[in-house]
Amino acid sequence: MSDKTVTVEQIGSPIRRPFDQEATLVGLGLNKRHRRSTLKDTPAVRGMIAKVAHLVRVVE
């Protein structure tokens, strides 16, 4: 099994966003703008990134 990772950076604020989007950011390990988090590249993580795609950016 390969140990692929994905790094995401928060570029948007969760202020005035639905609670589930804020909770998704916390699940990704993000809480403030311009913070980065490195996670395992799994379908669950990819789904979370897709849910808040307007608030995060994938760093390659």
From Swiss-Prot:
Similarity-based family: Belongs to the universal ribosomal protein uL30 family.
A single GO cellular-component term on record: cytosolic large ribosomal subunit
Record-level GO BP terms: translation
Quaternary structure, from the entry: Part of the 50S ribosomal subunit.
Molecular function as annotated in GO: structural constituent of ribosome
One Pfam entry name: Ribosomal_L30
Keywords linked to the UniProt accession: Ribonucleoprotein, Ribosomal protein
Biological source species: Xanthobacter autotrophicus (strain ATCC BAA-1158 / Py2)
Protein name in UniProt: Large ribosomal subunit protein uL30
Protein origin, superkingdom: Bacteria
Coiled coil region boundaries: none
